[in-house]
């Protein structure tokens, strides 16, 4: 399974568990931050064709919309949680540079800014625009894209 960083394309910041813990508590919010360290590495665990779990490598927890709803409303925070279920499935779109929840919405920086400050929370939202694009890059080279479905 490929290990990667999730990089906000517009700002160059990376998805992190808030506080940077190697074993964050359930429901720890996911934020954007400029730091790079081993506590913000992810892997993609394919479950059903293009759908899978985005796993935080250090803790084994996975990315969820807060509350684990199948169709979360706009502005629902993105968190890490230990539970695995179909309401925590995502597709990683290399061609359009987005991360889509199985409910049809996308991961965004809260507020939709193209250059959010450090510790900006991430949310689920239905809009599509350049400020919600993410790319998947190597921990060894933050400018080198990697295939997460490998």
From Swiss-Prot:
Cleavage of the collagen like domain may decrease the agglutinating ability and alter carbohydrate-binding properties. The function of this protein could potentially be regulated by proteolysis in vivo. This protein may have potential in cancer diagnosis and treatment. A synthetic analog of this protein with enhanced carbohydrate-binding properties may be designed for the purpose of constructing a biosensor for cancer diagnostics or anticancer therapy. May potentially be used as an immune modulator in mammals, because of its effects on macrophages and its ability to promote secretion of cytokines. D-galactose 3 binds at residues 75, 108, 111, 127-129. D-galactose 1 binds at residues 16, 19, 35-37, 119. Keywords: Glycoprotein, Hemagglutinin, Lectin. Hemagglutinating activity of the human erythrocytes is fully maintained after heating at 50 degrees Celsius for 3 hours. The activity is partially lost after heating at 55 degrees Celsius and completely lost after heating at 65 degrees Celsius for 30 minutes. The keyword Glycoprotein applies. It comes from Crenomytilus grayanus (Gray mussel). This is Galactose-binding lectin. Coiled coil: none annotated. CDD domains: beta-trefoil_Ricin_MytiLec-like (cd23417). Transmembrane segments: none annotated. Contains a collagen like domain, which probably promotes oligomerization. Changing residue 108 to A: Retains slight hemagglutinating activity and has 6-fold decreased porcine stomach mucin-binding activity. D-galactose 2 binds at residues 27, 64, 67, 83-85. GO terms for molecular function: carbohydrate binding. Changing residue 85 to A: 5.0-fold decreased porcine stomach mucin-binding activity compared to wild-type. The keyword Glycoprotein applies. Glycans are attached at residues 26, 74, 118. Galactose-binding lectin. Binds both alpha and beta anomer of galactose (Gal), but has a stronger interaction with the glycans having alpha Gal at the non-reducing end and binds beta Gal weakly only in highly branched glycans. Has high affinity to Galalpha1-4Galbeta1-4GlcNAc. Binds N-acetyl-2-deoxy-2-amino-galactose (2-deoxy-GalNAc). Binds N-acetylgalactosamine (GalNAc). Binds porcine stomach mucin (PSM) with high affinity. Binds galactosamine. Binds laminin, bovine submaxillary mucin (BSM), fibronectin, type I collagen and gelatin with a decreasing affinity, respectively. Changing residue 16 to A: Loss of hemagglutinating and porcine stomach mucin-binding activities. Induction: Up-regulated in mantle by challenge of yeast P.pastoris reaching the maximum level at 12 hours post challenge and recovering to the original level at 24 hours post challenge. Highly expressed in mantle and to a lesser extent in muscle, hepatopancreas, gill and hemocytes.
């Amino acid at each position: 399974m490929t290990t990667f960083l999730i990089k906000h394309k517009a700002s160059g910041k990376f998805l992190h568990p808030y506080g940077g813990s190697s074993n964050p508590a359930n429901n720890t919010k996911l934020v954007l931050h400029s730091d790079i360290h081993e506590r913000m590495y992810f892997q993609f665990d394919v479950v059903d064709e293009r759908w899978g779990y985005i796993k935080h490598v250090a803790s084994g927890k996975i990315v969820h919309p807060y509350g684990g709803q199948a169709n979360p409303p706009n502005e629902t925070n993105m968190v890490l949680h230990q539970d695995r279920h179909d309401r925590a499935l995502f597709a990683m779109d290399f061609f359009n540079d987005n991360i889509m929840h199985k409910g049809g919405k996308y991961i965004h920086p809260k507020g939709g800014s193209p250059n959010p400050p450090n510790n900006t929370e991430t949310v689920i939202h239905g809009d599509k625009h350049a400020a919600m694009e993410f790319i998947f890059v190597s921990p060894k080279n933050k400018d080198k894209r990697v295939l997460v479905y490998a």
